């Protein structure tokens, strides 16, 4: 029987005619991943190339077919993934199986470019809803918002525009966010706000822990520049230093427009130093799979090397092997 430590998974593909093809315990692999640097969730698995009504399955299933993944932990089937077949790989030398790669709706935002202009004074949620309405998706917004200056988003991926807006909020508030699609709705949440906090513990479900510490991406000094003068030069109006004596100078620059005070610009600079002013530690965790855990969740880890609460940066569920790989901070 399915349980939280022995979950069951099944995939479902709906072809162009509306016929449903279910795969439970028949696929030879099934991975569901949420990478750190992308908002699109990815699914990949091998499909048995069985014969259905005289046709091979590889000739029935095509790209853009609807793709769903469900899990059961003992309380019935729940949806884990909703998206599309994006890639189909077949191999003439081995016709027994073929490979499916699917993505949720965010893949369209990552592969489509657009331009937007927003006048000064627009709130974060207003900007994001404008983008969402134009592209036909809904947003559930559970994150902080600010009043933005004039914003020009020119010829870039829709997902990059969304992230650019949210990065401005993070710089000014210091709060981290997570973005993901669930049932075709885009969720924007503050990280670590999940109501159920699952644990990874030694001798229970933890399998392997490793830690990486790096200075890559650090900032120890922030230069604040004002608006350009008639010669195109941008004057330095302030400099905020972090721990340059220990780590050396790793400099970032931010711009202060005429509507932003130096005090507020310094506040933004201090938020950058708070987030990036010391070496980054990333912990990689391999544990028995828990399909409920997703990117942005808070998890409790208790092992010899780690103890406390951590935020999930990325996660891969290997349903076939019943393990999950997480990167946490």
Language-model features, listed with the residues they occupy:
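Flexible glycine-/small-residue-rich
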Residues: 47, 102-104, 190-192, 226, ...
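Short beta-strand-centered interaction patches in the first periplasmic/extracellular domains
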Residues: 95-109, 141-216
């Amino acid at each position: 029987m399915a349980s939280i430590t022995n979950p069951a998974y099944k995939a479902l593909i709906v072809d162009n005619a509306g016929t449903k093809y279910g795969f439970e315990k028949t696929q030879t692999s099934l991975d569901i991943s949420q990478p750190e640097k992308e908002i699109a969730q990815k699914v990949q698995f091998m499909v048995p190339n069985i014969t259905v009504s005289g046709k091979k399955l590889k000739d029935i299933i095509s790209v853009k077919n609807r793709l769903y993944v469900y899990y059961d932990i003992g309380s019935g089937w729940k949806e884990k993934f909703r998206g599309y077949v994006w890639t189909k790989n077949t191999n003439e030398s081995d016709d027994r199986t073929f490979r499916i790669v699917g993505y949720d709706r965010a893949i369209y935002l990552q592969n489509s470019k657009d331009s937007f202009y927003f006048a000064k004074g627009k709130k974060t949620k207003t900007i994001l809803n404008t983008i969402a309405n134009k592209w036909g998706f809904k947003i559930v917004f559970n994150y902080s918002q600010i009043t933005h200056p004039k914003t020009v988003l020119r010829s870039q991926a829709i997902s990059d525009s969304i992230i650019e807006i949210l990065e401005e909020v993070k710089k000014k508030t210091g709060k981290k966010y997570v973005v993901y699609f669930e049932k075709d709705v885009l969720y924007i949440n503050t990280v670590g706000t999940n109501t159920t906090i699952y644990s990874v513990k030694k001798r229970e479900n933890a399998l392997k822990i490793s830690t990486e510490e790096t200075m890559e991406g650090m900032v120890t000094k922030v230069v604040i520049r004002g608006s350009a003068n008639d010669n195109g030069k941008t004057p330095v109006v302030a400099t905020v230093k972090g721990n340059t004596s220990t780590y050396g100078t790793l400099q970032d620059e931010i711009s202060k427009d005429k509507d932003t005070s130096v005090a507020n610009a310094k506040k933004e600079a201090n938020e950058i130093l708070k987030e990036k002013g010391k070496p980054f530690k990333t912990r990689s965790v391999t544990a028995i799979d828990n399909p409920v855990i997703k990117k942005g969740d808070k998890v409790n880890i208790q092992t010899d090397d780690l103890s406390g609460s951590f935020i999930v940066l990325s996660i891969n569920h290997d349903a076939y092997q019943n393990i999950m790989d997480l990167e946490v901070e």
